[in-house]
């Protein structure tokens, strides 16, 4: 994530001079280039381009020191959890640059939720009071152009009230909030990277949102005891207008979301494909799914009017359930079986694979996107044929990041580790190569220390 010049330690400690003038907000934004930091899925990063990210002094501590007036090497946007905020932090200094007010209001310091402008963004009741005062941000993701972040917009979720918020990159302020209809526990969020059909649209125009909790549809209390009526909605939000374009109802629950670099596919890892109402039922199956959405087909169905509408909402809803999508050549969705109650799904930077982490299984499933498209063309009968690797990497896999050199880094919440493993080696091992070295290293901080355990 840094170049050779950024790794060098200078012979002398630089002093604040004309070369390192205090940086204004406009200069900060003007000297920031975009970089995707696909870590735990909680942050989106900006890379500062001033002075090659020079380090401040000798040693490990010196390399993390950023003197007043200097830029950090990277800037990240983090979710703030129950604070309802998005936070901008510098790396490696760790300085908190700004707290962007989003969902929690009113805030006396910033005026968020007090001014007329912010009230209009947040939404109010007929009496003028705020509709909601709290929120729970989990994930922040930025808009794309030419396959990388362009810094125009950033989006975050509200898991409490099913809302999506947009932050304008040039202002670092929230400018729009949309409530997703018939959605509870909105968790997974990811923008598309280009249009699935028009090659000229090589930038983000959609944001995909996965509902974690299935609910009876319609959710009016009339069918709460009927398990078959419980479904979850996958929503597509227009990146510019922030209006909900369409929704796709599916079986089971959804967690996190990923989108392909060619714009053709979006996916969400799923748990509770059993459609159970109690924990024992939700965790009975050894495999759940990573459900893929064929964006072009869904939007053709919407345009053709092959939709329904849920009472109380004007958003068109297509049927993505298994029962309605048995023929791959006409299917809107593809349910790829993966173990067990998976938590995260992440796209490899080469655009070839989605990695679906097992959470209740010690595995990470590598799904070949070309094979998924082949399934939609009727070339594979079993969606499981799209899986090309499933290495055992440790207990409680959650999120996966990549280094651009063929290696994946997956967090393990039970083992309290980050494990480094090689994707190509995992594919070879899946084919029967017993000499393939899949797991390369582990970082263990289970007892407060950090240790490397190279295999």
Describe each region flagged by the PLM.
Residues 32, 41, 50-455:
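Predominantly soluble domains enriched in secretory-pathway, periplasmic, or organellar proteins
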Residues 1-27, 34-40:
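N-terminal secretory signal peptides
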């Amino acid at each position: 994530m840094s170049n050779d010049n950024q790794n060098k330690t200078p012979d002398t400690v630089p002093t604040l001079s004309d070369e390192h003038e205090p940086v204004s907000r406009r200069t900060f934004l003007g000297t920031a280039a975009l970089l995707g930091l696909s870590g735990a899925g909680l942050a989106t990063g900006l890379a500062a381009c001033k002075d090659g990210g020079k380090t401040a002094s000798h040693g490990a501590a010196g390399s993390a020191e950023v003197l007043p007036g200097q830029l950090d090497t990277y800037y990240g946007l983090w979710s703030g959890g129950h604070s309802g905020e998005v936070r901008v932090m510098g790396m490696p200094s760790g300085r908190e640059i700004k707290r962007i007010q989003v969902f929690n209001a009113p805030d006396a310091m910033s005026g968020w939720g007090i001014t007329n402008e912010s009230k209009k963004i947040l939404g109010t009741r007929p009496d003028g009071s705020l509709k909601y005062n709290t929120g729970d941000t989990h994930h922040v993701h930025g808009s794309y152009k030419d396959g990388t972040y362009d810094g125009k917009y950033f989006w975050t979720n509200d898991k409490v009230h099913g809302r999506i918020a947009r932050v304008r990159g040039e202002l670092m302020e929230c400018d729009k909030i949309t409530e997703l209809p018939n959605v509870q526990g909105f968790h997974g969020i990811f923008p598309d990277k280009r249009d699935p059909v028009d090659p000229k649209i090589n930038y983000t125009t959609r944001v995909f949102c996965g509902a974690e909790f299935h609910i009876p549809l319609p959710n009016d209390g009339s069918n709460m005891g009927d398990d078959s009526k419980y479904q979850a909605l996958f929503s597509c939000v227009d990146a510019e207008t922030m209006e909900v374009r369409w929704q796709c109802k599916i079986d089971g629950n959804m967690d996190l979301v990923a989108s392909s670099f060619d714009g053709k596919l979006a996916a969400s890892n799923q748990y509770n494909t059993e459609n159970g109402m109690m924990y024992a039922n939700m965790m009975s199956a050894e495999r759940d799914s990573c459900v893929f959405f064929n964006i072009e087909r869904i939007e053709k169905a919407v345009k053709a009017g092959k939709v329904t509408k849920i009472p109380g909402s004007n958003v068109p809803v297509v049927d993505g359930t298994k029962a309605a999508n048995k023929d791959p050549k006409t299917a809107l969705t593809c349910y790829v079986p993966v173990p067990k109650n998976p938590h995260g799904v992440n796209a490899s930077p080469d655009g070839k694979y989605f990695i679906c982490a097992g959470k209740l299984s010690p595995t990470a499933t590598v799904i070949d996107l070309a094979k998924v498209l082949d399934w939609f063309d009727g070339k594979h009968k079993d969606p499981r044929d799209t899986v090309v690797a499933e290495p055992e990497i440790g207990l409680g896999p959650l999120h996966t990041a990549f280094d651009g050199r063929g290696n994946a880094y997956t967090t393990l919440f039970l083992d309290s580790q980050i494990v480094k493993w090689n994707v190509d080696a995992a594919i070879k091992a899946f084919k029967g190569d017993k000499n393939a070295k899949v797991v390369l290293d582990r970082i263990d901080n289970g007892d407060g220390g950090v240790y490397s355990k190279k295999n």
